[in-house]
Amino acid sequence: MASESDASSIATLSCARCEKPAHLQCPKCIDLKLPREQASFCTQECFKAAWSSHKSVHVKAQLSSIGDQNSDLISQGWLYCVKKGQARTPKLPHFDWTGPLKQYPISTKRVVPAEIEKPDWAIDGTPKVEPNSDLQHVVEIKTPEQIQRMRETCKIAREVLDAAARVIHPGVTTDEIDRVVHEATIAAGGYPSPLNYYFFPKSCCTSVNEVICHGIPDARKLEDGDIVNVDVTVCYKGCHGDLNETYFVGNVDEASRQLVKCTYECLEKAIAIVKPGVRFREIGEIVNRHATMSGLSVVRSYCGHGIGDLFHCAPNIPHYARNKAVGVMKAGQTFTIEPMINAGGWRDRTWPDGWTAVTADGKRSAQFEHTLLVTETGVEVLTARLPSSPDVYPWLTK
C-alpha cells in the first residue's frame, strides 16, 4: 500500500499513472531509493490499479543492485562456476532459471594444510579407488575396527554441521557457512570430503529454497524467510561420515515449515524400519507414503548410498515408491538415508555450474540425512544429534 508523503516534497510531482498531482509515494520505491518521479501517485486507487506493472520497477532495481554487487565481487576474484567446477567465468551463465534464485559468484578454493590426511581426489579432482571398487556392487560388512572409525568420524561430522547451524541467520552468505565448515573440519583433523570431489569447488553443499541438493556455497546472503540445507561430509582416519539438515532463516512461512517438518519425519520413519532382513527398497515405500499423504513429492534423481572407506558405494537407497533397489539389510552395513522432498513436482533440473539441482517448477525443497549402522537388533544412527546440538526444530525436545 502506498504511503502518504510530506506534501511539500511531492507538490511538483505528477502521478506515475494518470499524471494528476501526486499525494502518495510507493514505500518500496522509497526503500530502494528510486527516483520520486516513478514512485508518486495521486490516490491509493490509482496506485493499486498501476501495481501489476509498477512492481516490475522494483524487480529491475533489485536485479541492477545484484549486478553491481556481483561486479564488485568479480573485481575481487570471485567468479561464476561452470563445467562441474572445472572452469570459472566472470559472466552470469545463461539459463532459464526455474525460481527466484540464480547463480552467484564463488570465492577461490579453500586450502587444506599439508598434515591433514587427504582422499585421492584432493589434488586432481578425480577419485581413483572409488569408481573401480568391488564395493560398488557388493555391500560391505564392516569390521569392528571400521565401525569404531566410522563412529569417530560421524561424531566429528555432526559437530561440524552443528557449528554451521549456529551461524545461520539473515545476512550471512553461504560462502561464510562453507568457511565455518571448512575450518571446523580442519580443526578436528579431518578433510571436507566434498572439496574437489569430481571438482566440486567447496567444502560443503548449501541448498537454498528451490535448490534440491548440491548447491555450491556462494556470495548470496541468506534472506529472512529462506530455508537452507547444509550437507556435510568429513573424511577422518580414512573413512567418511555424511549428514545434512534443513534450517529456517528468520521468519519462515507456514508452508515451508511444514515441508521441512514432513521431510524430517520421512527420514525418521525410514530409519525406524532399519534392521537385518529388511529390503532396501522398503525405505522408498515408507518415505513416499508419508510425503504423498502431506501433498508433497519425492525426488527420484538422487538417492542414499553406502559409505565407509569410500564416500559413495553400494547399496543404492532410492526414496521413492516401487523402486528396484536390490539387496537386504545385514548387521555391519553402513549407508545413508537422505530423502529430498519437494513442495511441488518431483522433477529436477541442473544449473550451468553442473552441480546445483533445482526443482523444475521453482517450488521449495527440503532434505535431511543420517549415516546409519545396521546392528544385530536394529540400527545405530552414527550422526545422531548431540546434547550440545543447536535447538532449532520446535518439534524436537532434548
UniProtKB/Swiss-Prot annotation:
Localization of this protein: Cytoplasm
Range of residues in the leader sequence: none
Binding-site list for Zn(2+) 2: 26, 29, 54, 58
Any one biological process term the GO annotation gives: N-terminal protein amino acid modification
Zinc finger (C6H2-type): 12-65
Keywords of this entry: Acetylation, Aminopeptidase, Cytoplasm, Hydrolase, Metal-binding, Protease, Zinc, Zinc-finger
Positions carrying N-acetylalanine: 2
Residues annotated as binding Zn(2+) 4: 242, 305, 338, 369
InterPro entries found in the cross-reference section: Creatinase/aminopeptidase-like (IPR036005), Pept_M24 (IPR000994), Pept_M24_MAP (IPR001714), Pept_M24A_MAP1 (IPR002467), Zfn-C6H2 (IPR031615)
HAMAP family from the UniProt entry: MetAP_1
Family assignment from sequence similarity: Belongs to the peptidase M24A family. Methionine aminopeptidase type 1 subfamily.
Name of the featured protein: Methionine aminopeptidase 1A
Protein source organism: Arabidopsis thaliana
